[in-house]
Every structure is written in C-alpha cells, then in structure tokens.
Amino acid sequence: MTELPRPDFSFTYKPSLTTLFRFSALTFNGHHIHLDKDFAQHSEGYPGAFLEARRERGPSLFAERLVHGPLTALMLLEVLQFYKPGLQLHAFEYRARNPVIVNRNSTIYGALTSENKADLWCADDDGVVGMTGSVTFSQ
C-alpha cells in the first residue's frame, strides 16, 4: 500500500451490532462472520495473525464480528458526499486492507488529490487501515 496523503476531511463513527444486523438484512447477507461472535472466532481464520498481532497493542479483539466490506465502502462515499455535497460520481474503486471490527471507532478520511479525484480510507484508533478507495467525480 502506498503512503496515504494528508487528509482534507474526516468523520469518526462506531459501527454497532444493530448496524451490522440491518445491513445484513438490507443486502440479504446472512454470513455469520458479521452476526455470530463464536463463528467469527472459530471459522475462516479469525482470529488470525491480524488479530493476534493487535491483541498485544490493546483490548482483545477475539470473538468479535467483522463489519461488511461494502458497508465500509458506502461509508467512504457518504463521508465524501457530506464534505462535498452535489458531486456526480463517475468511478469508484476500493480495496479492503484489514478487517474492520464492530464496536470500535472507525475514522473515514478523504483527500482531494485533484479537481475531480479524491482518495478515501478508513482507519481504526490504532491507525490500522481497513479500506482504501479512490473516486473520480464532477461538480
């Protein structure tokens, strides 16, 4: 991952269990990794090396649910729209970098890199980047 630019704007939120449940219902995504603590702990490699490494730096993240990637991507776009209302989006690319954990602060950052482009990313309180993205738009 390349170095992130200095942000022009940011917004911090805490994805809750209710948010995950509602997003799962709206998208017909019943994957247990978003809804079931035991499943998140014992299946699909979570907790994996990522969570093991982070456990040394703070409270245990074991047995927690993961935020949907598309929900985080939508939050990137929402924060951009709050900062620059009325944009016409032309292209959006995003990439999940690390799991985003429920009930932990997530800060969405954005940097306007040109007249019609912005780089966006989400990071937790430890500075771990969960997602990066770029948007092309017109005003």
Summary of predicted features, one role per range:
Residues 53, 89-91, 122:
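Generic detector of low-complexity/intrinsically disordered segments
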